[in-house]
Amino acid sequence: MEIKEYENNPYHLAQLVDLINYCQNIEAKLDIKMAEQDDIFQIENYYQNRKGQFWIALENEKVVGSIALLRLDDKTAVLKEFFTYPKYRGNPVRLDRKLFERFMLFARASKFTRIVLDTPEKEKRSHFFYENQGFKQITRDKLDVDYIFPDRDSRIYVKLLD
């Protein structure tokens, strides 16, 4: 298993789209169209050229996980596009934790002091993961930054970094 920064590759992009579609629409039944998240088709410009990053996890050259950091300003970043196929979650692989650790290393090295994220209300497994990582749920009116996301009755979480 390898976690690496995304490089423009049509084969990996197609697999990333499959992963996201599986997690959002087949598994979670959220009915989110790729047109609602066109950042996936402009990773370099949307994330990497703006002092953020996008990582993919590969097993035998197959994309099995992803996570992204979107820079909003010098202090705030958004955790986005965090997906893994079910068999890679939890023990024994723990890809979810490995991707999150990579994200946090970059966030701390980049001197962000706050991470925000959104996640659909019905994604209880995600809520549990984020809360175990120190994220606190906030109401939307407490979110003082703006970013685009496919809202599905979403919860907003924040984590302050040391």
Predicted regions and their residues:
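Acetyl-CoA-dependent GNAT
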Residues: 5-88, 100-102, 106, 160-161
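A generic secondary-structure micro-motif detector
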Residues: 33, 92-93, 116
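Conserved glycine-rich acetyl-CoA-binding loop
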Residues: 62, 85-101, 109-110, 121-127, ...
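Short, solvent-exposed loop/helix junctions and linker helices
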Residues: 10, 92-93, 151
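C-terminal "cap" of GNAT-fold acetyltransferases
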Residues: 2, 22, 113-116, 120-124, ...
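Glycine-centered flexibility sites
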Residues: 52, 65-68, 94-96, 134, ...
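Residue-level signal for short amphipathic helical patches enriched in basic/charged
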Residues: 31, 110, 118
